[in-house]
Amino acid sequence: MAKSQAKKKRGHRLRNGGRDVLLSRGSTPSFSTHGRMTKSKKEILNKRKHKNPYDHTAVDDKDFFVPQKAA
């Protein structure tokens, strides 16, 4: 591959007694910089695959309306 214009200029400065600009670069960060993606619909469905869909113990019963009989 060809050298970039910036790399050529850095090499020219080094050869002619200039300072190494690579020393000015910061170090790598202490945390991971890879991209994180949200789960796809398929991954979410596979996670819930073996759970009981009729288990209503985790849901409060405020959404149900039961009319009371008039006495």
Curated annotation (Swiss-Prot):
The segments labelled Disordered in the record are 1-39, 51-71
Compositionally skewed regions (Basic residues) per UniProt: 1-16
Bias (Basic and acidic residues) ranges: 51-64
Q: From start to end residue, where is composition biased (Polar residues)?
A: 25-35
Q: What is this protein called?
A: Uncharacterized protein YqkK
Q: What's the source species' lineage?
A: Bacteria, Bacillati, Bacillota, Bacilli, Bacillales
